[in-house]
């Protein structure tokens, strides 16, 4: 990330020395126990999707906290890992909206310009949200602010109350915000199912003269 557009623009949004603070945090927590995702995948979202390519942002809360699940991409798991409940519901809504995606791995979305960003980028094994509020929010808020400043239209997909709180970071009127209940089994029937975020995203992109996302890839 160090020589990327991401690095330069995120750095401008953060206090002096914040990257060093993050590296110190990572050194400490990875030395102290099992942390997900693997350290080399902590920044996978911005390493896979260049800033210039971002057309869509799907914001999650924090990584999966079970073995071999987290890849550094929100909601995604490797294909040899069963889809967790929220991802099952995302794929169910996708099937109802556009068609069936066979893969649980969402890397193909990231490679097409879908920034799969979690607000927190690390989690201890078995302890959801344990790193919330420690270091990540200023960093990931900075990423959202950087995307907000893009001159090209972007779709921000915000699922659930946590993600929807980030609306105040999205001030550019040319962007589209799609929001609904979270795909979690606890809330999916309260407005996530039937919200058609995938076709709505593509309709917007096409209307703006941009390539739609192949959500089934």
UniProtKB/Swiss-Prot annotation:
Any matching Pfam family: UDG
Reaction(s) catalysed by this chain's protein? Hydrolyzes single-stranded DNA or mismatched double-stranded DNA and polynucleotides, releasing free uracil
Assign the protein's first listed, main location to one coarse class.
cytoplasm
Domain of life the protein comes from: Bacteria
Which Enzyme Commission number(s) are listed? 3.2.2.27
The catalytic residues are 62 (proton acceptor)
Keywords linked to the UniProt accession: Cytoplasm, DNA damage, DNA repair, Hydrolase
A single GO cellular-component term on record: cytoplasm
Listed GO biological process terms: base-excision repair, AP site formation via deaminated base removal
The entry assigns this protein to a family as follows: Belongs to the uracil-DNA glycosylase (UDG) superfamily. UNG family.
Job of this protein: Excises uracil residues from the DNA which can arise as a result of misincorporation of dUMP residues by DNA polymerase or due to deamination of cytosine.
Recorded hits in PANTHER family, A to Z, give: URACIL-DNA GLYCOSYLASE (PTHR11264:SF0)
Read off the HAMAP family from this record. UDG
In terms of NCBIfam families, this protein maps to: PRK05254.1-1, PRK05254.1-2, PRK05254.1-4, PRK05254.1-5, ung
Q: What is this protein called?
A: Uracil-DNA glycosylase
């Amino acid at each position: 990330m160090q020589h990327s557009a991401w690095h330069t623009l995120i750095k401008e949004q953060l206090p002096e020395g914040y990257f060093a603070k993050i590296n110190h945090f990572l050194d400490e927590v990875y030395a102290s126990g099992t942390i997900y995702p693997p350290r080399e995948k902590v920044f996978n979202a911005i390493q896979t999707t260049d800033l210039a390519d971002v057309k869509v942002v799907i914001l999650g809360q924090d990584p999966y906290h079970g073995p071999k699940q987290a890849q550094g991409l929100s909601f995604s798991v490797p294909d040899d890992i069963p889809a967790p409940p929220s991802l099952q519901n995302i794929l169910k809504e996708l099937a109802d909206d556009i068609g069936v995606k066979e893969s649980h791995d969402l890397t193909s979305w990231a490679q097409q310009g879908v920034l799969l960003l979690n607000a927190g980028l690390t989690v201890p094994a078995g302890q959801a949200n344990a790193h919330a509020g420690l270091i990540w929010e200023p960093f990931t808020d900075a990423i959202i602010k950087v995307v907000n400043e893009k001159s090209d239209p972007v779709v921000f997909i915000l699922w659930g109350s946590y993600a929807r709180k980030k609306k105040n970071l999205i001030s550019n009127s040319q962007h589209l915000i799609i929001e609904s209940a979270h795909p979690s089994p606890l809330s999916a029937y309260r407005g996530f199912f039937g919200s058609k975020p995938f076709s709505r995203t593509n309709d917007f992109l096409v209307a703006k003269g941009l390539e739609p996302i192949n959500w089934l890839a």
